[in-house]
Amino acid sequence: MSEPIYDARTLWELLERRVANSPDRAFLIDDADRTVTFGEAKNQAERMAAGFAALGVGEGTPVTWVLPTRIDTVVTSLALSRLGAVQNPIIHIYRDREVGFCIRQTAAELVLTPGEWSGFDYQAMVERVVADLDEPPAVVDASAGLPEGDPAALPPVPTVPADGQDAIRWIYYTSGTTSDPKGVLHTDASLMAGGVGLARALDMQPTDVGSIAFPYAHIGGPDYLVCLLANGFPAVLVEKFDLMAAIESFNRHGVTMAGGSTVFYTMFLGVQRQQPDDPIIPTLRLLSGGGAPKPPEVFFEVQAEMGIPVAHGYGMTESPMICQGSPTDTDDQLAHTEGHPVFAAAVTICRPDGSECDRDEEGEVRISGPQLFSGYRDPTLNDEAFDEAGRFRSGDLAVMRGDGHVTLTGRVKDIIIRKGENIAAKEIEDVLYAHPKVGAVAVIGLPDPGRGERVCAVVETAEGAEPLTYDEMVAVCTDAALMRQKVPEQLVVHDGPLPRNATMKILKYELKDALVDVPWSDV
């Protein structure tokens, strides 16, 4: 087995070096069991790059793509990397308003769509939003085939500048828990630093088999791609997530690492409970993911019933990896923290004045390091985003323990102020999640004339369970020794699943908007 490749400067260099080491090893496996090797993927990417070049794509050309998690999508991203294009991947849940905003702000010259996919016509949507532009981009329907050409006609591979100032190669938009997306600028180097951090923390090996069951257009997609290329192992791609179909596919291909977010853990756990003596995926060595903090109870349930650890991580669009749990961590570390800062990432917990907190003192997470983004597409947002020391203000609250592991405690803006008392929503959510009737929960603050804000718990009922009652909610909070002021005054049992974005993060602002004007009385 070859050594991992952790020092490449560009994504294309990483692919070339992987192909030189192991061209015939499996790389990508799709839902239909089609397998592409590293060498085959490079050859396909070069042909596709030649086709894009014939359309006028070159170094620095902005290209927007909204494509499903497919082999061809991964190859497309590699082909555009070969040319040095500036890629703007868009998650498939975006619609006219968001897609139009991204195309305009990035000044895209080419847009790639899947045509009609999953019951929605993406080609028609893009054609609508570009129709009124002064200089509309070319729009290509990938369902009719992507362009190809002769690799011999390709221009030279773009080089890294001698001054080491890496060029912007990616523009991602924030995942949509706020109303206005922000364009986040990344270089190949910053994305690869995140992927290397993840690979090191999870001790990824050439013998592993990974999985991408989340949208590849999410920043976690290319980050995971880096893991595959750096360590030389394959991944199973899931285009449309169906739980039982995914489990069958993972079993066929011997997947060793799976996950995506807390909701994936609980879905796998639900199937495992139906066959407690028979592992649903015997080859799994761990579940891993991120997107939102996991309740400690999830770790202990998965460990007890599936016999494997949950190694959860912490990242965001601006810094794809910040902290990551490791299979070598203790149970306490895995259950109660988001892991240790990843390789080369600098994480500081700060007071409002910017001074560093003591260990176990709550403060804001501020970040620096090679995995950090280069700023926003709208530069007017940068002054507020970075502090005087150049650290990114994450907006997340956390404590760094004595062992260097980080526990998220909430959001700076997710603090509920009830009668002058600061209440962290996450603390209450972790308590309520432990109740068997709770499938998912969001704790929000709603305007209240007597309290300033009142604490409202919005609960998604666990599959097969009866709805949680108010008295049961109070009892579980009391049993957990929550102070009385933190016990929610209001319980809303949500009709159906809680609203989520493409990475399964609960959209609290939608819940607040839906409930803010609903009459309520505690009398």
Regions found by a protein language model. Name each.
Residues 94, 100-102, 111-113, 258, ...:
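AMP-binding/adenylate-forming catalytic core of the ANL superfamily
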Residues 192-209, 216-257, 271-272:
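Conserved AMP-binding/adenylation subdomain of ANL enzymes
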Residues 482-503, 522:
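AMP-binding/adenylate-forming catalytic domain of the ANL superfamily
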Residues 55, 85-149, 463:
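Structural core segment of the AMP-binding/adenylate-forming
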Residues 3-8, 16, 24-70, 74-78, ...:
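Conserved AMP-binding/adenylate-forming core of the ANL superfamily
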Residues 8, 23-26, 141, 151-173, ...:
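Conserved pre-ATP/AMP-binding loop-to-beta segment of ANL
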Residues 230, 252-260, 269-333, 346, ...:
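Gly/Ser/Thr-rich phosphate-binding loop
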Residues 340-344, 355-385, 423:
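Conserved ATP/PPi-binding loop(s) of AMP-dependent carboxylate-activating enzymes
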